[in-house]
Amino acid sequence: RSSVALKEGGIVILDYGSGNIHSAAKALELAGARVSLSSEKSVAEAADGLLVPGVGAFSAVMAGINSVRGGAAIEKRLTGGRPVLGICVGMQVLFEHGVERGNDTPGLGEWPGVVTQLDAPILPHMGWNTVDAPADSRLFSGIADERFYFVHSYAAQEWTLEVHDPFPQPQLTWAEHGSRFLAAVENGPLTATQFH
């Protein structure tokens, strides 16, 4: 287990063995955030914000998250209305399950649905791509016409969550590579992006 002292007002990156935590930390620091890495559930729960990164196979990311009780920390944060951001496979594991190479792995189940392989002639989808964001998206405010960097072969390709008043509808942002897929979801305190 690892834990770097949480600086007051900071963001914790859940450290469960994912390969891109240092690049994520650097990006957040360049944006002015105070960043700490931790595999401790209590530290992840107490942070101002929690980042769930993810690189590699859905099953490996879930095994890593489960090994540090990350799912419980995420659930506790969301129950309390505290922000969580999932990136790449960190977004994918927020769905009910993922199917990769015939293996069906349970996810965290924050959203219904399955992550499957893109129906595209060239995989992985690697490079810059545009997105189709809602006009009132907070995440894409002022940058909706920009291009975003993707590296993936799997994604959530449909949205099945039905939300009824008085609850707000999640903001869904889509992209396309062979087939249409979710590029980002803004859902109360839970936000996730497929791009890096």
Regions found by a protein language model. Give the residues of each.
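An anion/phosphate-binding loop that grips the pyrophosphate of nucleotide cofactors and donors
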Residues: A47
